[in-house]
Amino acid sequence: MISDINALKYKALKYKKVLLKVSGEALMGDKQFGHEYDIIKKIAIDIKEVIALGVEVAIVVGGGNIYRGINAALVGMDRASADYIGMLATVINALTLQNVMESLNIYTRVLSAIPMMSVCEPYIRRKAKRHMEKKRVVIFAGGTGNPFCTTDSAAVLRAIEMNCDILLKATQVDGVYDSDPKKNPDAKKYFTISYKDVITNNLQVMDTAAIAVARENKLPIRVFSIKEQGNFARVIQDKGEYTAIEE
């Protein structure tokens, strides 16, 4: 149920159907590997706050906290095989996030691009849209189901397929910078940047293919920090700290 106050906020919202991309690294917090459950619970609470506004939410999770296919390929592993292992890592993350969210009474469904009938539903576009219409949070796992494609590309594709109003990328920093702010204290933050400039300046916020597809389909992107509680709800209301990527 949406409260009267949240119903008024919903009417004022510009974005009523959103896709949240959560990187694997965001799930491990300050650890070097695996999951930081306090961080995952914080993310789940943020999602619950957005759902309370009446917003339909979909999520794409990465797998970099467990396995990175591109890194394995660099040391000699077959790239396609490495990418498939990375896709399996996203399923682990999706199931972990689902369990934490369900402990907070958030109705959640995991849909995987790689069929795993005993643990989650296969990805079917119409089924995913129906889940969202019923106000269930849909977590997309398995990337695109194809090697050589990043989970950023999966996020853009799923956002477009679900007719989302916007894609929000949750990271460990509060936006897009011209260099790594963790390594360069003088890094410049972009508050607004075009798709073209992201590609031209080779900014590493998302891969080129993902940005190109977002640009072609006029899908706006917001990049923000997941570390600060309540940021997700603020960003979809055009508040808080973030970088806007659009035409």
UniProtKB/Swiss-Prot annotation:
UniProt-annotated binding residues for UMP: 63, 83, 144-151
Protein's UniProt name: Uridylate kinase
The UniProt record lists the keyword Cytoplasm: yes
Binding-site list for ATP: 21-24, 64, 68, 171-172, 177, 180
Subcellular location: Cytoplasm
Activity regulation comment: Inhibited by UTP.
NCBIfam families the record matches: pyrH_bact
Gene: pyrH
Gene3D superfamilies, per database record: Acetylglutamate kinase-like
An example Gene Ontology CC term for this record: cytosol
Subunit relationships: Homohexamer.
